[in-house]
Amino acid sequence: MGEFGEVTLGVAQAAPVYFDREASTEKARGLIREAGEKGVDLLAFGETWLTGYPYWKDAPWSREYNDLRARYVANGVMIPGPETDALCQAAAEAGVDVAIGVVELEPGSLSSVYCTLLFISREGEILGRHRKLKPTDSERRYWSEGDATGLRVYERPYGRLSGLNCWEHLMMLPGYALAAQGTQFHVAAWPNMASSASELLSRAYAYQAGCYVLCAGGLGPAPGELPDGIAAESLDHLTGESCIIDPWGKVIAGPVSCEETLITARVSTASIYRRKSLTDVGGHYSRPDVFRFEVDRSERPRVVFRDGDVDDRG
């Protein structure tokens, strides 16, 4: 006989240490440790938390701007690499599953980065990663486009886990691809949750997919820690506003504004089954005879050499 389970969800709302991946990694390890001490089963961080969202991306072009971009790319994180090894160790020691936004450095060129959502198990293993499919507006000054290899759910002891970055929730089809795989716990990684659109899209996805949504919003550095050439106004929207949403679209924890904190909620899987039994858009509430949807999850290497070798470093 199947039984409903209980799960403790957590969102780490904190600012990274900009342009310092080692210090940011140590801060993340501390937050993972704290989550473990509080009995959290799944911990979410915001979009590109390691090593930070490029909040100055809309600034006018200048030498300082270009220098910041170069430093940003140089602080990208290899997957796998020393930083992810350290995060895996922390997750294993704390017994916590982790979903963390990462500025992922492409190992092939060493000069391109992705907006990546990295999934780590409580056993200390990398479950997978999802590279943002379409960077939004001026984010394209920084991030490359990802493919669909990571558009999948992960079987965990408490249920099925998935995640998307920011306005991927607006694209609809990526979210449906995850709903069709039966997602039950979904991480919505945002640079912030301050806009009404962020909350609207996150609550809508929770209701449509019938899953819990961990909305992880980011914080920027303190005004006194701003890099040269960047105005304080750039930080106005990085106020966090992280929250946790139930399968009926109701906010059950948070939001919290402008404060470093760990937001938690103890939830039951019963709400997932009650919601999906009514309208399961990836199952009985769909019409595959009318609509056909195909996702190409094959890898897209940048280079295939004539001798047959594939440059799979990226």
UniProtKB/Swiss-Prot annotation:
Q: Which InterPro entries match?
A: C-N_Hydrolase (IPR003010), C-N_Hydrolase_sf (IPR036526), Nitrilase/CN_hydratase_CS (IPR000132), Nitrilases_CHs (IPR044149)
In the record, what terms sit under GO molecular function?
A: nitrilase activity
Q: Which reaction does it catalyse?
A: a nitrile + 2 H2O = a carboxylate + NH4(+)
Instruction: Cite the entry's keywords alphabetically.
Output: Hydrolase
Q: Domain CN hydrolase, which positions?
A: 7-269
- State its role: Nitrilases catalyze the mild hydrolytic conversion of organonitriles directly to the corresponding carboxylic acids. Catalyzes the production of aryllactic acid derivatives. Mediates the hydrolysis of cyanohydrin to (S)-phenyllactic acid.
As for family, the record states: Belongs to the carbon-nitrogen hydrolase superfamily. Nitrilase family.
Q: What is this protein called?
A: Nitrilase 2
The record lists the organism as Unknown prokaryotic organism
